Structure formats: C-alpha cells, structure tokens
UniProtKB/Swiss-Prot annotation:
GO CC, alphabetical: cytosol
Chief site of localization: cytoplasm
Source organism: Yersinia enterocolitica serotype O:8 / biotype 1B (strain NCTC 13174 / 8081)
Annotated protein name in UniProt: Shikimate kinase 2
Region (LID domain): 112-126
Length: 174
C-alpha cells in the first residue's frame, strides 16, 4: 500500500508525534500541513490568522493539503482541516484517514505542556479546557465522518503506531 495516510484530530491529539513515528516505520515521507504553511509563507499560524483571518488561513490549509498529498506520505493535518467539506472529501478519496481521538481534558493537558502549541491563536478566547470542549463538540462529527479508522490517542504513541501498522497490514491482505 502506497497511498497517503492522513492524520486528523484536535490540537494536541498527537498527529505530528504519531505521524512522524508512523512515517519512519513505513519508510514514508512525513509532512505537517501547519509547518508546511509556516515554512512556505515564512509566517507563524498566529501571523497568518492575524493577516488573513481564519477564512484565509483555512483556504491556505486546503491548498497545502492538496499540495502535499502524494504516495508514501503521512500527512498531519491541522485540527480544523475537517471543517471544509471539500477537504473531508479529498482526504477520503486520496488516502486513508486516521482520527486520533482524545478527551478535552487530555488535549488541554498536552497543550499546556507544549510551548509551541501554546503560541497558537485561541479559537474561542476561552480557557483551554473550555475551548477544547467547544472544539470537540463541533468537530467530533466531522472527524468521525472523514475517518476510515478511529484510534484512542491517549495511549502511548508507539502503541498507536503499532495499531496503525496492523490496520495497514489487514488492508493489504484484503
């Protein structure tokens, strides 16, 4: 199997950590769409949002998603990539979509520990746990809709990678 593997989930779910480890295990390339945009535009996510608003950021996110999609690539998407129906359709048609699911409390803990994630602009202006509850309430149905497979992202990353490798092996057999 050489199709693109898309990692979806909220900020702090482990898309980058698990995506990198999965790509290494498979001998695939790894791309984080947020980092791709930051490098391409030479701006942080906060700067892009300040300059272009969330709508402009989401448009760039969609373009980045299509640009980086290629065989033998693991793509960590931005948490809001699923907000676009076109993105959800694109990912389902062009690869396998893995939803890394975690509770708002777990996500908030992880975000509080990660100084890089702390620099992301707030989506709601609320404290992080409340924000994650709101974000998950609105996005959970979209993550579920787009996902070919839903995995518990509260497990250690190496266990999640093993589960994905088993899924890929099963898909190959079919």
């Amino acid at each position: 199997m050489t199709q693109t593997i898309f990692m979806v989930g909220a900020r702090g779910a482990g898309k980058t950590t698990i995506g990198k480890a999965l790509a290494q295990a498979l001998g695939y390339r790894f791309i984080d769409t947020d980092l791709f945009m930051q490098q391409t535009l030479q701006s942080s996510v906060a700067e892009i949002v300040a300059r272009e608003g969330w709508d402009g950021f989401r448009l760039r996110e969609s373009m980045a998603l299509q640009t980086v999609t290629a065989p033998k690539t693991v793509v960590a998407t931005g948490g809001g990539a699923v907000l676009s129906h076109d993105n959800r359709t694109f990912m389902r048609q062009h690869g396998m979509v893995i939803y890394l699911r975690a509770s708002a409390n777990v996500l908030a803990e992880r975000l509080a520990e990660d100084p890089e994630d702390a620099q992301r602009p707030s989506l709601t202006g609320k404290p992080i746990v409340e924000e994650m509850l709101d974000v998950l309430a609105s996005r959970e149905p979209l993550y579920q809709e787009v996902a070919h497979h839903v995995l518990d992202a509260t497990q250690p990353p190496e266990e999640v990678v093993e589960q994905i490798l088993h899924i890929l092996a099963d898909e190959k057999v079919k």
